[in-house]
């Protein structure tokens, strides 16, 4: 399945040209492309949603000359060589995000009205995953550098996101110890525990007031999501994960502290690319920061948290 190990002649895209005191990442060359990428007809469509917290200066992003001959803004100029393959969109309107300050992540992908008495709706990534998810081991992948979530289920419950690159890599590409039988026993135990939780919660629900029942219902929805994912994991037990070259594993299967934000983000982005290349998932959300605060970015001269 993986193009990483079966096509030994492929050059890693992060291979660097080193000399005269600098390092430069190579552009995408033909020798870096896997054979399966030769034909666009066979390529699945993928979606990745990356959230930049605390806003941006829209004047630096917006396209001021539209149409086929559009001109990229200053901050988007590094995409110039790809301009024929992308469509920048400006002027989107998100009225339900007004006035919620540092909680915009809650409705960024749902567009729903959200408040103390409102229930969120399904996020666009999960709508897409509902169509493409049956074809991959993971219907979607939820990532966040500080745990704040973007994906929302059809019942309005936020899906958990992982922030540790090593945990993400192992979940995608490392077979659990003990073989298939041990994995199946572990999943069966999880299902049994979930059944007990659901059974106890149903009996408790009749004793609660309206507000508490609503909160319990949201909790039970989250439990059911875990149950669905557990059953899905069991259905994929007989399908081996792709084998990843040890050099690539060494670069990506590691804990990267947030204090090294540039390294952290590059590692997460590379894991996303690898997940797409091996078709482990076709939908990803990645929240790159926390609303209201910002970590130091030593690579660009920001040496302390904000």
PLM feature spans:
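Ligand-binding pockets and gating/stacking loops
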Residues: 1-306
């Amino acid at each position: 399945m993986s193009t990483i190990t079966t096509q030994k002649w492929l050059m890693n895209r992060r291979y660097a040209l080193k000399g005269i005191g600098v390092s430069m990442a190579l552009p995408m060359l033909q020798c870096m492309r896997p054979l399966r990428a030769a034909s666009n007809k066979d390529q699945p469509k993928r979606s990745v949603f990356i959230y930049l917290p605390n806003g941006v200066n829209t004047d630096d992003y917006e396209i001021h000359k539209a149409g086929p001959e559009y001109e990229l803004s200053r901050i988007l100029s590094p995409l110039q060589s790809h301009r024929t393959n992308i469509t920048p969109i400006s002027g989107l309107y998100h009225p339900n995000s007004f006035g919620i300050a540092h909680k915009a992540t809650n409705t960024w992908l749902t567009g729903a009205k959200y408040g103390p008495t409102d229930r969120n709706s399904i996020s666009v990534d999960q709508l897409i995953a509902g169509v493409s998810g049956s074809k991959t081991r993971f219907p979607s992948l939820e990532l966040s550098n500080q745990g704040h979530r973007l994906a929302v289920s059809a019942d309005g419950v936020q899906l958990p996101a992982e922030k540790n690159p090593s945990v993400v890599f192992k979940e995608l590409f490392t077979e659990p110890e003990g073989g298939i039988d041990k994995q199946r026993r572990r999943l069966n135990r999880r299902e049994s525990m979930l059944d007990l939780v659901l059974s106890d919660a149903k009996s408790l629900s009749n004793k609660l007031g309206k507000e508490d029942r609503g909160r319990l219902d949201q909790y039970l929805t989250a439990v059911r999501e875990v149950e669905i994912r557990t059953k899905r994991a069991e259905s994929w037990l007989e399908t081996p994960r792709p084998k990843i070259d040890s050099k690539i594993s060494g670069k990506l299967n590691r804990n990267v502290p947030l204090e090294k934000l540039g390294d952290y983000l590059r590692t997460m982005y590379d894991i996303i690319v690898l997940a797409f290349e091996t078709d482990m998932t076709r939908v990803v959300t990645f929240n790159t920061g926390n609303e209201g605060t910002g970590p130091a970015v030593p690579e660009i001269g920001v040496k302390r948290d904000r």
